[in-house]
Amino acid sequence: MKALTTGEILEKVSDSAIPKATSGFWKLFILAILAGAYIAFGAQASAMASFNLTSDPATFGLGKLVSASVFPVGLMMVVLCGAELFTGNNLMIIGVLDRKIKVSGMLRNWVIVYIGNFIGALLVAALVNYSGLLESGGGLLGAVTVKTAVSKTSLDFGKAFVLGVMCNWLVCLAVWMATGA
């Protein structure tokens, strides 16, 4: 099996927008909840693999490398399990530009998937909190998790937007490459 050309990937991504835009509410919503959970699992695994390293200035860079190496497992679960992730579904714009789906179908998908992703992530966050995992390392994992959350929610809008664009660019690139593989 050979890898797809750029044109073939473009066509496949465009065609994939059709079932995403026409999928039933409950199917889409459940797949979106699962995607949010998978990304949260990836984030939790990333934090657990790196919290000792990122909490020490001497090993902070290595900790970020470990974290960045583990986190994509969440996206792999999304792609391999066929779940619906808002960031990857931004590629649906290609289907709109090719006139294969309507803007309204794309926007419907985005709203349902965004809400479902949020619920899935909250569900995993609640499970992790209830499980006691945040007490790992004498509570250091919880402290690092809170510090990360505070730093992300304290960003001004401009920085948060630019970081979001950069993140989404990489997610879409990963989905694009997986489509071509």
Labelled PLM ranges:
Residues 1-181:
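Alpha-helical transmembrane segments and their helix-helix packing motifs
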